[in-house]
Amino acid sequence: MTTPNGMPDNPGDPENTDPEATSADRAEQAAEEAAARQAEESPFGQASEEEISPELEAEINDLLSDVDPDLDGDGEVSAVETQLAERTEDLQRVTAEYANYRRRTERERQGIIDTARAGVVTQLLPLLDDLDLAEQHGDLNEGPLKSLSDKLINILGGLKVESFGEIGEAFDPEIHEAVQDLSQGDVKVLGTVLRKGYRLGDRVIRTAMVLIGDPEES
């Protein structure tokens, strides 16, 4: 039953309600309620400019106060260049220190090796002296001693050990031990070699024992 304006007498009566319109209204209402609940549950949905905590606002102000309003692009570039120069200088210093460390370590390592080699050669000196005497008497021309002498000389050469002290060499008090000076002039040479000297590189293992004489006239 309807009124003169076309509206039903009782709009809420199920008989006067459009089922499709009612379903649409309920769905829209349910969506609005769900959106409202989600906004209430979300921490971001409740935030506003007036709800910022005093602690957060104070922290923001502190950060803003650290910004230099007079800093321009040129100032930033200059600061970066200064810092880059300082870091480059630090890198160069560290590189130089490392290079010096490596050189020092290498010298120490080589010194240890040379000391060990010198110790081995020192123990072989009596054998070397016997072989020199055998050579002077002609016993090293052939036979087992010749083979032994050649092998020992090769070993010493591999260790960079060399002998010195030959007749006619200029006398050097740093490496020659003079038993007697038979020279009559100012120029002194080795007249007789009583015992050869040996050195390892620049290190003298043993000085040569010699008699000083005059150089032979040519």
Curated annotation (Swiss-Prot):
The entry's localization annotation reads:
Cytoplasm
Q: Where is this region: Disordered?
A: 1-75
Tell me, what's a Pfam family for it? GrpE
GO MF terms here are: adenyl-nucleotide exchange factor activity; protein homodimerization activity; protein-folding chaperone binding; unfolded protein binding
Keywords, comma-separated and alphabetical: Chaperone, Cytoplasm, Stress response
> Which segments show compositional bias classed as Basic and acidic residues?
23-40
What are the BP-aspect GO terms?
protein folding
- UniProt biased composition (Acidic residues): 48-75
Q: Name one GO cellular component term.
A: cytoplasm
- Entry-linked InterPro entries: GrpE (IPR000740), GrpE_coiled_coil (IPR013805), GrpE_head (IPR009012)
Q: Give the top-rank taxon of the lineage listed in the UniProt record for this protein.
A: Bacteria
The UniProt entry, under PROSITE patterns, shows:
GRPE
Query: What's the family?
Result: Belongs to the GrpE family.
Instruction: Please describe what this protein does.
Output: Participates actively in the response to hyperosmotic and heat shock by preventing the aggregation of stress-denatured proteins, in association with DnaK and GrpE. It is the nucleotide exchange factor for DnaK and may function as a thermosensor. Unfolded proteins bind initially to DnaJ; upon interaction with the DnaJ-bound protein, DnaK hydrolyzes its bound ATP, resulting in the formation of a stable complex. GrpE releases ADP from DnaK; ATP binding to DnaK triggers the release of the substrate protein, thus completing the reaction cycle.
How this chain assembles, per its entry, is:
Homodimer.
Stated name of the protein: Protein GrpE
Q: Which gene carries the instructions for this protein?
A: grpE
